[in-house]
């Protein structure tokens, strides 16, 4: 993976946006469909990647959706929901496995031939503004935020391991090579922020 080889890439897509900037309930939604593909250009078989065929780059996310809805309670309180979702990151699944001294070694032929589960998350925030005080030289506000409101276990990466015991419904069904998924921030996370601006 650290070798530098000759190749080419292409990227294309389209973005749609919907906004409501005014009113007690306001917000916006963005949807993007895009592709990011790579292809090696090597005549030597050993230097080819994916047999010189197009394959998704590590940054290929065909579908990305982001949205925010704000509820303006009064001039002091604002509640917001922010949702984000996108296609899973491409990764490479072994095409086969061979045994070498009791160790199962994966064989990779196709590059980025599978994807992690889709990523999505809902965040909530409550912003409390303070009115101007003649005894203070600044104006401040508090923001209370809860990230990952519904405890989504978003995959960060996928790793291979030697399978022991019964075979379940993992990717390598019937193979001695198993997989395990690494997730981060699996539960809601609370953040408190104080912002201030000097007059």
Give the ranges of each region predicted by the language model:
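Outer-membrane beta-barrel transmembrane strands
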Residues: 6-15, 19-21, 58, 114-129, ...
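Context-gated lysine
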Residues: 20, 24, 44, 75, ...
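Gram-negative outer-membrane beta-barrel transporters
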Residues: 2-93
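Extracellular/periplasm-exposed beta-strand and loop segments of Gram-negative cell-envelope proteins
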Residues: 1-8, 36-46, 51-59, 92-98, ...
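C-terminal beta-signal and adjacent terminal beta-strands/loops
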Residues: 76, 84-102, 121, 128-199
